Amino acid sequence: YPGAPKFDSSEFPGPKSQILLKEAPQYESMTRGAGEFPMVFDEGKGVTVKDPDGNLYIDISAGVGVSSVGRSHPQVLSAIESQSKRLMHASDMSNSKRGELAKVISSIAPPGLRDNCISYFAQSGSGALETAIKFARKVTGRNQILAFHGAYHGVWHASNAITTGDQYRSGYGPFMGGVIHAPYPYAYRFPFPLGGKSCEVVAGEYVDYLLNTPYTAA
């Protein structure tokens, strides 16, 4: 929308948005990450979003990656319309479009995987991570997972066990076992004293301790 950002309301959120935000908790869960953020999406075009009150915002989130080419992109809309007339859902059955996409992904994969990999399509990031955990455990025969403090991997059962942060974990335990968390080697707010060493070395030594000391259960 031209002119963004632009605010037509004298208050934020505007009156129409306030009504929707007030009603929302009565009918849907507000446990989403931005569930209480005082903004309502109504329309989107390009890199802009409009709320019910006509206020225009610049979207720098790209719809969490879903709208990387912009909202309401003409080619995307055309593809959605064309495919919806042909086939909207195929459950777990093979279908031509999914097969075409898997072939393209294999052809552009990094060296070593190019034309030598298969795809598994999931409905969400958390779902993809859950599948990756099952796949890794099945293929390797191992059950321990190492993740970094401060990392976000999802909010389903297994993915939530790997994710850290009170806003994601408080009240939902106990979590899946076999998960080990280690500090990321970044000097800003590094949790351990360095003793003259770099944070990369100290973090590496701690990971070595976690993985190679019997009583850490790793």
What are these regions (language model features)?
Residues A24, Y57-S61, Y209:
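Beta-strand scaffold of nucleotide-dependent catalytic cores
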Residues I19, E23, A79-S82, E100, ...:
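A non-catalytic, amphipathic alpha-helix used as a structural packing/dimerization or gating element
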Residues P38-D59:
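Active-site and channel-lining beta-strand-loop segments
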Residues K50, V69-G70, A161-T163:
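Short beta-strand-to-turn element immediately C-terminal to the catalytic PLP-Schiff-base lysine
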Residues K6-S9, G14, L56-L146:
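Glycine-rich loop-to-alpha-helix module at the N-terminal edge of alpha/beta enzyme cores
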Residues K103-A218:
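PLP-dependent aspartate aminotransferase-fold enzymes
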Residues Y1-K45, A203:
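Active-site-adjacent loop/helix segments that line or gate small-molecule/cofactor pockets in enzymes
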Residues Y27-A34, L87, G112, P214-A218:
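Short secondary-structure junctions and interdomain/linker hinges
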